[in-house]
C-alpha cells in the first residue's frame, strides 16, 4: 500500500520534503555543535554568535544537499528501473557522497566519500524490515 502511494508522488516532492527535514536536523546539529566549537577556538560575544550562525547554515546546507541529491537520484533510478532494491541506494549514495566531496577537488576524498555514503545507504536499505505478508 505504501509503495503504491510513493509511486504516485513526484520525485521533486519527495526531494523537497527530504531536504527540509534533513536540513533542519543539520541546522539543529549546528546549533548544538557551534557554541562548543566557538569556545574551543576562543571566541566570545558577537564573534561567537556569528560563528554559531555560520555553523547552523553550513551544517544545514550540507545535510540538505546530501539528502536532496540522494533522494532525487534514488527516486529517479527507482522510477527508471521499476525496482526498489539496493542498487538504487548504492548509486544514490555514491552520487550524494561525490557531490559533497567534490568541493575538496581531491579525487581520493571524492571516491572515499562516495564509497562511504554508498555503503551506509545500502546498509540502511538492507536493514529495512518489509514484510509483504503484514496486513497492518
From Swiss-Prot:
GO process terms (BP): monoatomic ion transport; protein insertion into mitochondrial inner membrane
Record field: transmembrane: 18-34, 56-72, 86-102, 110-126
The UniProt record lists the keyword Repeat: no
Positions of region (Contains 4 beta strands): 1-59
Alphabetical UniProt keywords: Chloroplast, Ion transport, Membrane, Plastid, Plastid outer membrane, Porin, Transmembrane, Transmembrane beta strand, Transmembrane helix, Transport
Subcellular location: Plastid, Chloroplast outer membrane
GO molecular function: porin activity; protein homodimerization activity
Membrane topology classification: Multi-pass membrane protein
Gene Ontology CC: one annotated term: pore complex
Pfam families registered for this protein in UniProt: Tim17 (PF02466)
Main location as per UniProt: plastid
Origin superkingdom: Eukaryota
Main function: Voltage-dependent high-conductance channel with a slight cation-selectivity; selective for amino acids but excludes triosephosphates or uncharged sugars. Non-essential amino acid-selective channel protein and translocation pore for NADPH:protochlorophyllide oxidoreductase A (PORA) and possibly PORB.
Complex and partners: Homodimer and oligomers in membrane.
Family: Belongs to the Tim17/Tim22/Tim23 family. Plastid outer envelope porin OEP16 (TC 1.B.30) subfamily.
Name of the protein: Outer envelope pore protein 16-4, chloroplastic
Natural source organism: Arabidopsis thaliana (Mouse-ear cress)
Record gene name: OEP164
Amino acid at each position: 500500500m505504501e509503495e503504491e502511494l510513493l509511486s504516485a508522488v513526484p520525485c521533486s516532492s519527495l526531494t523537497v520534503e527530504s531536504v527540509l527535514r534533513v536540513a533542519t536536523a543539520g541546522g539543529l546539529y549546528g546549533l548544538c555543535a557551534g557554541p562548543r566549537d566557538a569556545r574551543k577556538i576562543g571566541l566570545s560575544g558577537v564573534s561567537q554568535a556569528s560563528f554559531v550562525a555560520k555553523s547552523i547554515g553550513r551544517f544545514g546546507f550540507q545535510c540538505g544537499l546530501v539528502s536532496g541529491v540522494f533522494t532525487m537520484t534514488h527516486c529517479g533510478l527507482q522510477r527508471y528501473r521499476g525496482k526498489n532494491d539496493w542498487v538504487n541506494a548504492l548509486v544514490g549514495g555514491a552520487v550524494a557522497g561525490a557531490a559533497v566531496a567534490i568541493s575538496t577537488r581531491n579525487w581520493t576524498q571524492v571516491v572515499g566519500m562516495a564509497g562511504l555514503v554508498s555503503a551506509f545507504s545500502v546498509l540502511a536499505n538492507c536493514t529495512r524490515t518489509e514484510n509483504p505478508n503484514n496486513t497492518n
